[in-house]
């Protein structure tokens, strides 16, 4: 279980973030080396097992029924299709396979039973298994754990003050309750946020403060950069400043020494140099493969070449 060092108030987080960049990167790298192999990067693959028709109104998401993104809806994938993806991901070097469904919440019944069978089958490949399926009740979290689920992803997205500007159909409290249910079942918590939705630096610091208040703190923290999608409310958002991303990664690493800091959405828009700086700042995981749910993402071969250039290597053990 992970605990964030104290203090982690907004003012303390701001102090860490605003250090001169050489000092910030030095401290982040020092912490990173004390807790992780600095040459290793865990490769993860995310599969969209049910696409579109989500009743939530998350302003960034192409899968919402409230937006006109033109995305074609797809029903829950078959077990054979999911296993083919998982086996290909493992062959390409991924050690964690994540399955995402565009649901508001898990509902008991045949679809959930099919997801449980997917979890059991992927776990049998000796891979870490993660799901992101919306809100989850305690008894459902227990069943996922029994099926072999390693981690459950449920992002806070942003700080609590800015959150209502992004989502109104699900409260911050709803998200926290799901995270508590997952943790209570003994499932690792994967929880992070999205940068570039119009939030302020203070909103980003409040996100980190909220993550630090979780007990246990997340084992996995995805840091996403918004990929604007036509037809969504955030389609015209400005890109995240590169050094703002680097500072956010470094600050996250310092605050959460044991966590896997996952450089997630938006990598296709990042230069190799920016990604290298993020690794120096303490990122030690990426999502690899042609898509991240519905948005384009670097292919496995591209990521393998990047790691080779940097003298880094995929993490081979769970």
UniProtKB/Swiss-Prot annotation:
It is an enzyme of class 2 (transferase). Catalyzes the conversion of dethiobiotin (DTB) to biotin by the insertion of a sulfur atom into dethiobiotin via a radical-based mechanism. GO terms for molecular function: 2 iron, 2 sulfur cluster binding; 4 iron, 4 sulfur cluster binding; biotin synthase activity; iron ion binding. Keywords: 2Fe-2S, 4Fe-4S, Biotin biosynthesis, Iron, Iron-sulfur, Metal-binding, S-adenosyl-L-methionine, Transferase. [4Fe-4S] cluster binds at residues 54, 58, 61. Its EC number is 2.8.1.6. This is Biotin synthase. It catalyses: (4R,5S)-dethiobiotin + (sulfur carrier)-SH + 2 reduced [2Fe-2S]-[ferredoxin] + 2 S-adenosyl-L-methionine = (sulfur carrier)-H + biotin + 2 5'-deoxyadenosine + 2 L-methionine + 2 oxidized [2Fe-2S]-[ferredoxin]. Homodimer. It comes from Gloeobacter violaceus (strain ATCC 29082 / PCC 7421). InterPro entries: Aldolase_TIM, BATS_dom, Biotin_synth/BioAB, Biotin_synthase, Elp3/MiaA/NifB-like_rSAM, rSAM. Binds 1 [4Fe-4S] cluster. The cluster is coordinated with 3 cysteines and an exchangeable S-adenosyl-L-methionine. HAMAP family: BioB. [2Fe-2S] cluster binds at residues 98, 130, 190, 262. Pathway: Cofactor biosynthesis; biotin biosynthesis; biotin from 7,8-diaminononanoate: step 2/2. Residues 36-258 form the Radical SAM core domain. CDD domains: Radical_SAM. Belongs to the radical SAM superfamily. Biotin synthase family. One of its GO terms (biological process) is biotin biosynthetic process. Gene3D superfamilies: Aldolase class I. The keyword Iron-sulfur applies.
